[in-house]
Amino acid sequence: MASERQKKIRNFCIIAHIDHGKSTLADRLLEMTGVLTEREMEDQVLDTMEIERERGITIKAQAVRMVYKAKDGEEYILNLIDTPGHVDFNYEVSRSLAACEGAILVVDAAQGIEAQTLANVYLALDHDLEILPVINKIDLPSAQPDVVKKEIEDVIGLDASEAPLISAKNGINIEAVLESVVKNVPPPEGDENAPLRALIFDSYYDSYKGVIVYIRVKEGTLKLGDKVRMMYTNKEFTVTEIGYMKPGGLVPGTQLSAGEVGYFAASIKNVKDTRVGDTVTTADNPAKEPLPGYKKVNPMVFCGIYPADGSKYGDLRDALEKLQLNDASLTFEPESSVALGFGFRCGFLGLLHMEIIQERLEREFDFDLVTTAPSVIYKVTKTNGETLYIDNPTNLPPPAEIKTMEEPIVKATIMTPTEYVGNIMELAQERRGIYKDMTYIDEGRVMLTYELPLNEIIYDFFDALKSRTKGYASLDYEMLGYRESDLVKLDIMLNGEIVDALSFIVHREKAYARGRRIAEKLKEAIPRQQFEVPIQACIGGKIIARETVKAYRKDVLAKCYGGDITRKKKLLEKQKEGKKRMRQIGTVEVPQEAFMSVLKLDT
């Protein structure tokens, strides 16, 4: 049973599809409960990174404490845990949800339910959260609250008859949301006197205090000065500061008890010691079991990142280390390429994560970067029975040693207006998709389920999906596992030399078309030399496509007026010999633009 103190606490989060008004609603709740004065208000208070605001997405989880005086005259402590909404950060979302008892589901009155809304709702249901539907943007002329209510009931199976109709932008009916939280979200439970068990749902690095760890205390009490142990990493630290969060700052206190959400600092030097999902307990009276649900997050998408200016290699390492302080899911290791020099092989949770890291490197650290084509992890079984996981095409063993190759497969859920179903099916087939299911949500919208290779999604599937549906379709995907596939390594040779940065692993059916396109693109991008340069795409020893960059040549016959043909032949032969010798000793400089144009190929 919840104690008297716990009965006054509500821990909840807000889940929504991108652009349905999650951050705006959070702003209004903060304003309504007086956490922020109007002067302090700026849009999307909880999205602290510039990129978060620009793209209108939430990347890092945040947490805020509000005090609200309800209509029943009691004061309640409301802890809002802001979650990322994007599929790449799915694990972070699941840990943030595990720190709550309830979730506000924000649905746009004009758009209805979207793919990511569904994905997050299912996650919330997995954690047994009380879900409160809220219909936002009712001030829009195209709003259809009744249709959306019916959609919520039909698709998710939630009773939406009581759902507050609000406009977060104009501050309409916000109080109804707070009342609904107080009334419907169950208070936290947990014995304050039991051994401490607290869930880490986020952490970030502060250059003065070390790592600041965000926790939800499930059982027991954590006090200032306690010696704590992380149950998965087994590291021990002494708490130097403890308290709760408010926008733009921390409020130090003396202790956190079961049911509360707060933070602590303990002079921790590395974010890797405070893994999201880990359990914190005290060293002198440890809990027997950690909290369930911890997973080590593994990167899914890899690419090489190189500084355009080779002398900046050291600076790039420093920048990646700084980003890693706040982002334990980013991995990188040094690699070198004949074509691009020294750089790093970086691992990311997904495409959005990769784009954000690249953008932050370019924006916050002012780098000019060259990135190689993204690749996924392939599972290779060799003829001697050994299993390898390959994230870089250059590490692939020779074809004779490979018994089977498997690639990661995802389950993709696509929501679309009915008129675009044909286009989407065509796109999914082009990308080797396997059709699984199709459900009509209402007269105008359909939910399609496909199994697709991750390799086909990571280039530009999302862009292609948007362009074929005029921007109306939404996509969500989750990992299914590995499946055997007929994959080959496609190498590009310039002047007989393999260019390592342009190697790809590709499905055999697509290899010819891909090789042909790359060769054509390189032919346009590589400047002419004094000798002719053959560009060849090959699989193993077999050339599947070839283009030639023609040589510049001097007109050696200009000074021959008439005269014997053998004289002309002699001069041409001599020129040919010279070009041949030049070609043997010449090297081809590949300009940066040539790499970029190949990597931007529509795949």
From Swiss-Prot:
PANTHER family: TRANSLATION FACTOR GUF1 HOMOLOG, CHLOROPLASTIC (PTHR43512:SF4), TRANSLATION FACTOR GUF1-RELATED (PTHR43512). One of its GO terms (cellular component) is plasma membrane. SUPFAM superfamilies: EF-G C-terminal domain-like, P-loop containing nucleoside triphosphate hydrolases, Translation proteins. GO terms for molecular function: GTP binding; GTPase activity; ribosome binding; translation elongation factor activity. It catalyses: GTP + H2O = GDP + phosphate + H(+). Required for accurate and efficient protein synthesis under certain stress conditions. May act as a fidelity factor of the translation reaction, by catalyzing a one-codon backward translocation of tRNAs on improperly translocated ribosomes. Back-translocation proceeds from a post-translocation (POST) complex to a pre-translocation (PRE) complex, thus giving elongation factor G a second chance to translocate the tRNAs correctly. Binds to ribosomes in a GTP-dependent manner. It comes from Acetivibrio thermocellus (strain ATCC 27405 / DSM 1237 / JCM 9322 / NBRC 103400 / NCIMB 10682 / NRRL B-4536 / VPI 7372). Residues 7-189 form the tr-type G domain. Keywords: Cell membrane, GTP-binding, Hydrolase, Membrane, Nucleotide-binding, Protein biosynthesis. It is a peripheral membrane protein. Belongs to the TRAFAC class translation factor GTPase superfamily. Classic translation factor GTPase family. LepA subfamily. This is Elongation factor 4. Its main location: membrane. The keyword Ribonucleoprotein does not apply. InterPro entries: EF-4, EFG_III/V, EFG_V-like, EFTu-like_2, G_TR_CS, LepA_C_sf, LepA_CTD, LepA_IV. The lineage of its organism: Bacteria, Bacillati, Bacillota, Clostridia, Eubacteriales. It is found in: Cell membrane.
